[in-house]
Structure formats: structure tokens, C-alpha cells
């Protein structure tokens, strides 16, 4: 085990124990054990995130992550939910990865479920359609929200046409162009390229 020192500001030192594991797929797993902690947090961060969205299909990375829990080769969405609910597990997707939380002793079960979701998602067409509708509804609401528009306008002002100048979950127009095939291709390239 190594100890990594974090220095958020001058004079403050935080020592965090970290165990590093190299996985067969080429990814690195960093573990910071907290013996006796009531909750375990698992996080997966991907290189690239929304920067890998295809042109005119911005929001692909976000939707890919959002749909990982909607069915896998071995489990339907309902079967995944039936496994997660008794554990009190929570999984949240973002354009840059996944975050999950569970009672401390259940972390191995959660890790197995996450592995299935990450390695074998199916992106069912009906679930893709539903998630796109939800995202488009969110985008319509944000279009009328001055705070959301100010944040996006500021990003565009600072970053211009760079990918950081747009919302990580795309636009009404770009989300329309995304389908199951787009998501499978992105997943293959960004999540399991090895």
C-alpha cells in the first residue's frame, strides 16, 4: 500500500492510503480502504468523457453511462434493480464514468454487478428512446432556465467551439441523432477498448 499526499492549500496536509491494482483490461483500480466504514464508494472515471462524443451527436457519453443499468447480456433492467435494491445500492452515471455506493459489507456484490454493466450492456432500443426523451425534456426545461443558460453561455464564452464549451449531455438537436448503434460504438471505444 502506498500513501498519497494531497495538498489542497498551503499548510494543510492530508494523507490518504491507496492500493493500486492493474486490471486485465488495462485499467488501474485505486482502492482507499476504510476498515469499519459503514458505506463503500466505488467510482469509475473514463479518459475522454464528453470529449469523445461524435460530432453532431454530443451527449453520447452521457447517454451511454445512463443506459448501462438498463439491461445487460445476462440481466434485464428489472433483474439489475432486484439485485441492487436489497443492498440499498445506488449507481449514478455521468459523461465521464460511474459512481456507486453501498453498505460496506456488500461492496463485492456491487462490484460484480458493476462489472456486468460495464462489460456487457445491451442498450435496448426502447430504453434508448425513453432515456433520449427524458434528456430532451430536461434540455427543454433548461432552455427556459436563466441560470442554466448563463452557465452554458459562460462556457461558450470561455471555451468557444472546444468540447468544454458545450453541455456534457448535448443539445436537443444532437441528442436526436443518437441511437443504439451510436451508443454501442462509443461503449466499445471508450469503455472496453482493450
Question: How would you label these PLM feature ranges?
Answer:
Residues 24-25, 192-194:
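Short, well-ordered loop/turn elements at secondary-structure boundaries
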Residues 33-34, 168:
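Short clusters of small/polar residues that mark proteolytic maturation junctions
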Residues 35-37, 47, 159-163:
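Short connector loops/turns at beta-strand edges and beta->alpha or beta->beta junctions
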Residues 41-106, 144:
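M16/MPP (pitrilysin/insulinase) zinc-metallopeptidase core fold and M16-derived inactive scaffolds
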Residues 25-27, 46-50, 179-182:
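Short, well-ordered turn and helix-capping elements at secondary-structure junctions
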Residues 1-33, 39, 43:
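Proteolytic maturation boundary segments
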Residues 81-193:
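Acidic/histidine-enriched segments that form metal/cofactor-coordinating
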